[in-house]
């Protein structure tokens, strides 16, 4: 596996190549917003973006482990990552809530998340970028042209931690998502290992899982709904 960084015409690029056959599929998923050029994935940032040096250092040090976790070749210590998230944001105005598989896992579902997905406001997205400045693998991105959200952030703290800030109303059309404004208006609070965590309602997560044809996940949610 090889990584390189360069700056051209005011843009600094991060690139990774030579991931190998066993990591090719997870690379396609994790690096889906990178540009693909043959066997290399690359992403550019304005060269004057604050924090690029630490992002590059973190990216190069954790990229292989991150891909191996995504391929399930290495365990994903999501509990450790979530505890660190809770510790770092405790008492601070971060305003995040859980989405995806981790939102089910903290309810007690028999599921092992591959990462931790968060949803928050735009201000909170920037705040998380400050709180995790030492662990960012990409700078927090502000992109109003995205159909999903205005902000994106990614860090690696023993496992991948991703967040979106200010999700767009369009993510709830034609059907509500489990990470958009509809879910945000219906959040529930659960207790997990001493922490109070906000999660979307199970019926929304079930509907999303059914649309994605995640039959095993639907069965897990049904079991929780029938308790």
Residue spans for each PLM region:
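A generic signature of intrinsically disordered, low-complexity regions enriched in glycine/proline
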Residues: 12, 119-121, 154, 166
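Generic structural signal for short, solvent-exposed loop/turn connectors between secondary structure elements
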Residues: 108-111, 157-160, 225-227
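Catalytic core of pol beta-like nucleotidyltransferases
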Residues: 30, 48-50, 55-68, 72-79, ...
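Short, glycine/charged-enriched secondary-structure capping and boundary segments
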Residues: 111-113, 133-134, 213
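Active-site nucleotide-donor binding segment shared across nucleotidyl transfer reactions
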Residues: 84-116, 120-127
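Helical scaffold of the NTase/Pol beta-like nucleotidyltransferase catalytic core
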Residues: 1-97, 222-227
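Amphipathic alpha-helical segments
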Residues: 122-139
């Amino acid at each position: 596996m090889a990584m390189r960084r360069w700056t051209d015409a005011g843009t600094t690029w991060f690139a990774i190549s030579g991931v190998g056959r066993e990591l090719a599929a997870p690379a396609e998923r994790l690096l889906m917003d990178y540009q693909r050029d043959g066997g290399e994935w690359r992403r550019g940032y304005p060269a004057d973006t604050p924090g690029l040096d630490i992002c590059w250092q973190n990216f190069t040090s954790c990229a292989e482990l991150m891909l191996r976790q995504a391929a399930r070749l290495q365990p994903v210590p999501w509990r450790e990552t979530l505890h660190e998230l809770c510790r770092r944001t405790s008492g601070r105005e971060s305003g995040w809530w859980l989405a995806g598989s981790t939102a089910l896992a903290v309810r007690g579902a028999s599921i092992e998340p591959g990462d931790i997905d968060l949803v928050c406001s735009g201000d909170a997205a920037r705040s998380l970028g400050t709180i995790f400045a030492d662990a960012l693998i990409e700078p927090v991105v502000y992109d109003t042209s995205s159909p999903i959200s205005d902000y994106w952030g990614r860090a690696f703290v023993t496992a991948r931690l991703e967040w979106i800030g200010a999700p767009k109303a369009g993510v709830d059309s034609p059907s509500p998502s489990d990470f958009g404004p509809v879910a945000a208006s219906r959040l529930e609070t659960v207790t997990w290992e001493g922490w109070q965590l906000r999660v979307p309602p199970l019926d929304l997560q079930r509907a999303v899982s059914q649309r994605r044809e995640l039959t095993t996940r639907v069965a897990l949610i049904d079991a929780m709904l029938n308790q």
